[in-house]
Each structure stands twice: as C-alpha cells, then as structure tokens.
C-alpha cells in the first residue's frame, strides 16, 4: 500500500506517519509538507511544497496511492479570524481532495475532524469542520474521523496549555469515547483503507474498535 500524508509535522500526523512507516503492509509513505521532516526512513518520500491551495509541480505525490491521510489542522484558538481557520480546515482539505480525485480516483480520502463537530453547531470550529466533512464526502466519499483527545507525538504547534495538560489527559484512557492513541488512529485509518470504508463519520469509540481489528 502507498499512502500520502498531510500534517506530518503535527501531533496527530506525526503519530500517523510513524505508524504507517512501521506497518508491514505499507511499502511507501509520501508526505507533503512546508518544511523538511526531522525523520528519515527508507519508505518515506517528502515533497516540500508551500501552497496548499495549488499543487502544481507535486501532482506525482498523489499518483498511484491507495489512501490520503489528511491530518493537517489548527486549533481555533491559534487563529484570530474565521476566514483563516476556514482556509486551513476546509479549503486546504478540499483542494487536496480534488487533486487526489484526478490523480488516484480509487484512493480513500481520510479527514481528521474532531469530536463535537456539528454543521449547525454553536461554535465556529464545529460548523467549519461540519461543512468540510459534508463537502469532502460529496466530492470524494471521504471517511471523516472524529477523535476526542489524541495522545500523539509532541508538537511545537500545540497550544502551551495542551502540552502542560497532556499527562493528565492520559487519565482518560479507560474511556473509549474520550481518548485514543495516535498510533491507534493510524492503525484505524490503514484498516479502514483495507476494508474500503468510505463516506462515513467515525467517532472516537469506533476508532478504537477499528484499530483493534488491524493486523487480525
């Protein structure tokens, strides 16, 4: 299996990247990123690219893959305007899905959304993510993942409070609706690809259940 990852420098994406590199069933991992990765691996191909609305010159990264794992995102607390949050959350994902549809029409597009996403929700971030899920499912039959707390790779992009609270948040591990390891999120995405799972919204407890099927 060949997979393409976005957001490999982030907490969720970094965990998914390492999971894919360690997976016996994955023979090539491609990552589109704005800056070089610290990690090197024989399976890994990195495409440095700065414009996430246009993919001229890196279309080959999308060609011949079985899955695109879109882990790119930002906390709404880290941007000052809804327009900026919408561009990062919605527009970047839709642009990538359009290129994937053209280059690898049979590939599965995975989008990391989040627990509490609701298209008519009270909060701006929930509405934007809900609209993104809707548009991606219409465009490419995307599989949309709604994890709660992702216990993933430490990232400089995390809000400082989240970094401080991470050890305490691990106390949520016994609660299937509230906690998932980054590794398990990666395993669930690979398992869903193998099962050709499309056009679904998957909540945290089901993520853990799908991950438990991986490799069995």
Language-model segments: which ranges?
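N-terminal Rossmann NAD(P)H-binding glycine-rich loop of SDR-like oxidoreductase domains
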Residues: 2-25
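NAD(P)H-binding glycine-rich loop region in Rossmannoid oxidoreductase-like domains
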Residues: 3-4, 38, 45-95, 99-102
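Oxidoreductase cofactor-interface core, primarily capturing Rossmann-like NAD(P)-dependent enzymes
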Residues: 22, 27, 42, 118-215
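Conserved Rossmann-fold NAD(P)-dependent oxidoreductase catalytic core, especially the SDR/UDP-sugar
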Residues: 23, 35, 74, 79-127, ...
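Short, polar loop motifs at secondary-structure junctions
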Residues: 31-38
């Amino acid at each position: 299996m060949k997979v393409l990852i976005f957001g490999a420098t982030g907490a969720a994406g970094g965990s998914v990247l390492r999971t894919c590199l360690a997976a016996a069933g994955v023979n090539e991992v491609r990552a589109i990123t704005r800056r070089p990765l610290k990690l090197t691996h024989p399976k890994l191909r990195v495409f440095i690219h700065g414009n996430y609305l246009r993919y001229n010159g890196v279309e080959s990264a999308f060609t011949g893959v079985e899955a695109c794992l879109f882990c790119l995102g930002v906390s709404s607390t880290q941007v000052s305007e809804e327009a900026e949050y919408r561009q990062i959350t919605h527009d970047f994902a839709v642009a990538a899905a359009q290129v994937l549809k053209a280059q690898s029409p049979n590939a599965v597009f995975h989008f990391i959304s989040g627990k509490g996403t609701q298209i008519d929700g009270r909060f701006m971030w929930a509405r934007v993510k809900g609209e993104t899920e809707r548009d991606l499912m219409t465009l490419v039959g995307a599989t949309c993942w709604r994890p709660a707390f992702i216990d993933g790779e430490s990232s400089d992009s995390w809000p400082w409070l989240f970094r401080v609270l991470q050890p305490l948040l691990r106390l949520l591990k016994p609660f299937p609706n509230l906690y998932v390891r980054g590794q398990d999120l990666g395993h669930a995405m690979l398992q869903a690809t193998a099962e050709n799972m499309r056009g679904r919204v998957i909540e945290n407890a089901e993520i853990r259940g799908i991950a438990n099927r991986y490799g069995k």
